[in-house]
Regions:
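Transmembrane-helix signature of polytopic, membrane-embedded enzymes
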Residues: 10-15, 106-130
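Extracytosolic helix-loop segments that constitute the early lumenal/periplasmic catalytic or substrate-binding loops
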Residues: 22-27, 41-65, 72-75, 79, ...
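Transmembrane-lumen/periplasm boundary regions of multi-pass, lipid-linked membrane glycan transferases
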Residues: 41-47, 180, 189-299, 309-320
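Transmembrane-helix motifs of polytopic, lipid-linked glycan transferases
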Residues: 93-117, 154
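Membrane-interface transmembrane helices that cradle and orient dolichyl/undecaprenyl
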Residues: 114, 153-173, 295-296, 342
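Hydrophobic/aromatic-rich transmembrane helices and adjacent perimembrane loops
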Residues: 320-350
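Signature aromatic-anchored transmembrane alpha helix within multi-pass, membrane-resident enzymes
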Residues: 343-373
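Short periplasmic/luminal acceptor-recognition loop of GT-C membrane glycosyltransferases, typified by
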Residues: 372-460, 464-468
Length: 468
């Protein structure tokens, strides 16, 4: 019996990992493509699937002028479409995998820091059950964030390993991970580098790194694929680099772009978001992160690693333009900081086991219930039905019997977004249906129209006799 006892922790880890994976994949294909930015990514992927052009993302089969990020995510999505078909699962499956990899890497890193499997499991559990990890635009959907967060977590792993061992291979792995992050979402990885630099400075590893010739070779090797991609893209799509500058780099961050204008939000935007929704229950455990070094009476290296990363990253993104998904990379950082803080407190005094155990258990149950409910009951918000109504119609087999190539899509003049475009292209490929968009002034008698806005219906009633 004793020989089997050593496998109990392994079994518990597997069981808990299966549990926390459920909110990532359960009913992942029920909701249609989301407007920002999944539906655009899906069109990029289905067009690359058709053309085989692996260099340039396209929309309406013309080079992208809005979604300007390199195509690393698109490559994964095209591969997935070839496996699962032209559907939501084909677009979202890579994100689910990336999110699971994030949890595994986070577990591995915290375990290396503490050698305690339950502390490592706590970090992954906190991350997986935080709404800022799995909800819209994040771990369950075909946006860039799942891949980006995965790459960031891998970057933390290799940086920490370098700091602990000073092995050359981790320098090269760091350069590779940064290069992949750039090919995922441009220079957003740059917002992590100050925190990494500060930790290496704290850990007295900056000078050895700067003196190592492999640092510069790794930097060169990492830069080659990045510069090669942007150079080739500019050759194929002249003006691409100028668009990237305006829409992806500093003008976007400081909200001075000539192409995009963002709503001005307060500096506290992300802190409020984490408190109110993204870590709704776990936010109370962040108190432990503040208390841990004082109670432990030491500035622990592992605590500093996570706390420096999280604090500096949140301060940097709070200084620029804001979208709710920009804070996604902070969730694994905060989860790591909380888990390490619990570890420090327990090591300081065993009486904290019960003191911390009960509130952590309550937070775990509440957070998991929220995550499971989100996955189990996917539904449109009342204000999303007009935007996504056509998508629901086109993905329903019962409705497709009434659709022909003479059916046209008529959208609202002001809110005429096209999150359904992926479905239109999929129907053209799979069924030969060529559904075009039309305008109010082009409508002819006996046209069959797909509409989803009440304002459009009202305009039709004012000018035509209609049959629904």
């Amino acid at each position: 019996m004793k020989s089997y006892a050593k496998y109990i922790p392994h079994l518990l880890v597997v069981i808990v990992f299966f549990m926390i994976s459920i909110p990532l994949w359960l009913k992942v294909d029920v909701l249609p493509m989301r407007l920002w930015d999944e539906s655009r990514n899906a069109v990029n992927a289905i067009e690359m699937y058709q053309t085989g052009d692996w260099l340039v993302r396209t929309y309406d089969f013309a080079p992208e002028t809005y979604e300007l990020k390199p195509p690393l995510l698109t490559w994964f999505q095209v591969a997935s479409l070839n496996i699962f078909g032209l559907n939501e699962l084909g677009i979202r499956f890579p994100s689910v995998v990336f999110s699971l990899v994030t949890l595994i890497v986070l577990f591995s890193l915290v375990y290396r820091m503490t050698r305690k499997w339950y502390i490592a499991l706590l970090a992954s559990f906190i991350c997986a059950t935080s709404a800022g990890f799995y909800t819209a635009h994040l771990g369950r959907f075909g946006d860039h964030e799942a891949l980006l967060v995965c790459l960031y977590t891998c970057l933390f792993y290799v940086v920490y390993q370098y700091s602990s061992t000073e092995r050359v291979r981790y320098i090269y792995l760091t350069a590779l991970t940064v290069a992949l992050a750039v090919l995922c979402k441009s220079i957003s990885v740059g917002m992590l580098l100050p925190g990494i630099f500060l930790f290496l400075l704290f850990d007295k590893k900056i000078l050895p790194l700067l003196k190592n010739k492999h640092t510069y070779l790794a930097l060169l090797l990492g830069a080659v694929p990045v510069f090669a991609y942007y150079y080739l893209r500019e050759q194929v799509q002249p003006g691409y680099l100028e668009m990237v500058w305006q829409m992806e780099l500093f003008p976007r961050f400081f909200n001075t772009s000539t192409e995009l204008v963002f709503q001005e939000d307060p500096f506290s935007y992300y802190f409020n978001l984490i408190r109110n929704s993204q870590m709704e229950y776990w936010v109370w455990s962040l108190i432990l992160v503040i208390l841990a070094p004082f109670i432990a009476k030491k500035l622990d290296r592992q605590w500093a690693f996570w706390s420096i990363q999280a604090a500096l990253f949140l301060l940097i993104i709070s200084s620029g333009t804001k979208n709710f998904w920009y804070s996604a990379p902070a969730i694994p950082m905060l989860a790591g900081a909380i888990a390490i803080s619990v570890h420090l407190l327990i090591n300081k005094n065993r009486k904290y086991n019960l003191t911390l155990g009960l509130p952590l258990l309550v937070m775990s149950v509440l957070s998991y219930q929220k995550a499971y409910k989100y996955a189990m009951q996917p539904a449109e918000r009342y204000y999303e039905w007009e935007t996504n109504g056509i998508s629901h119609f086109l993905k329903n087999e019962n409705h497709l019997a009434n659709i022909t190539s003479n059916t046209k899509v008529l959208l609202d003049d002001q809110y005429g977004f096209e999150p359904h475009k992926f479905y239109i292209e999929a129907l053209k490929i799979e069924r030969g249906l060529d559904i075009k968009r039309t305008e109010l002034y082009n409508i002819k008698p006996y046209d069959t129209l797909l509409i989803s806005h009440l304002s459009t219906l009202q305009k039709l009633k004012e000018s035509y006799g209609i049959e629904v």
